Amino acid sequence: YVATVFTTHATVTGRCVAGNGLPLYKDLGRLNAGELARQFNVVAKHSIEKIASQEHDVFCTVSEITARECESLLGSTVDVVTPNGFEDDFVWNGREFDEKRAEARRAMIRTAEATLSCKFDGEPLIVGTSGRYEFRNKGIDIFLDALKQLAETDALDREVLVYITVPSATTGPRKDLQAHLADENSPIDPKQNRFCTHYLEHPEWDQILNSIAGSVLANPSSKVKVVFVPTYLNGRDGIFDKSYYELLVGMDMTLFPSYYEPWGYTPLESTAFSVPTLTTTLAGFGLWAGSQGEHEGVTLVARNDDNYAEAAREIAKALLHFTKYTPQEVEIARNAAAELSRTALWSELYAAYEKAYSEAIERSVTRTNRAVLNDGGGTTEQINFVRQQLITEKPHWNRVMVEKVLPKRLHALEVLSHNLWWSWTSGARDLFEYIDQKLWSECEKNPIVFLDRLPLERLQELEQDGSFLAMLDGVYAMFNEYMSEKPDPKAPTIAYFSMEYGLHSSLKI
């Protein structure tokens, strides 16, 4: 037998509610998860989560706040809370750490001065945030509002450099910025958005840039400077060419004021690099850090459904307070952050998983309806129970499969529908749209389903449609030419893996 453990790191319905600006927490006990799943078109995902949470030996999640969410939205009580741990073997030590930090600071200051066309008077306080581009869930909205309040504070007497490293839809690094970083005599293009390091596909709709535009953060004389890096920092971004960790190590403080955050690896990673961080009481990590007592390395801001303005003020206040730190106070906060991170190592947190696995094994024995007979000696025997099957008089249902048969003249349609070649060939797509555009849309552009639903009368019409047949013959000839090409045995083999996107919408994942 196999013991089963289901661990969820969020609920799809909860994430949808939070991400769409609806209150999640104060109405949690009254939310109708099934109806919400239908509204947000996530019925399948919600159903899988709900069934998985019920058909388990042990049900786990990563934080107490998500445990309450699961109980309300999935209807299942969490058996064991299993906080996320990590290994610190990716963190540099000693001299290498200091060199990496100094190098990161130089790179971030130099890039900001080039992007913003400014010059820092002294050493700025470098703060940052990162993660998925979920404007409300990740607290990017409240972070920007707090920065605006900070920028308008007369008590701010130090420049603050803010990096928002959140991947978005980009078309590559800015060429003018690349050229200027390679040669300072190369000019910066004034037509480009000066807050962004990369070209965005739709900058006019970007929530971060729109929040900055027209605010005090857009004022060149503001002491708070914001740079948006909308790409993955994987060492090949074209501007920094450094990994996320290679920039994180150079920051003075990070902020992750999330509204929806079942755990939150980003603030934990921050503490691992001795960077003090700010999080909230709506984040799993924030609640866990708060349970460790008062801590100089982590600032915890209270958030709920009704205190947005108050929380924004607290975040601005925490930032202002940090700008006033003496070098000794900064060192204390950095050491405290590193110390806290060591309590989140897997060696400290794995016990919760061991508990979950042990309970799962015990429950699976009961679930399998097996008994162990012991003869009192050293021999045991496992017996499978076989229950008596009651036979009742009832009708037997047999499944009958009815397969369509296309007219011979239209057989090419059948062939085309079973090869994804049609999905990237406009002529092939036009064929199916020509037949019945409305039905094509109703079938979600799935040619196999589409042909199954075509009425016989329409097929007979197509057999006599000269224009359509000429189009079909042309496309089919292109397809046969494509299929006749012999693959190059020396060509690279490509495999496609994605948890979110299929090759085509008709190919479900």
Model-derived features: positions:
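Catalytic cores of nucleotide-sugar-dependent glycosyltransferases that transfer UDP/GDP/TDP-activated
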Residues: 1-509
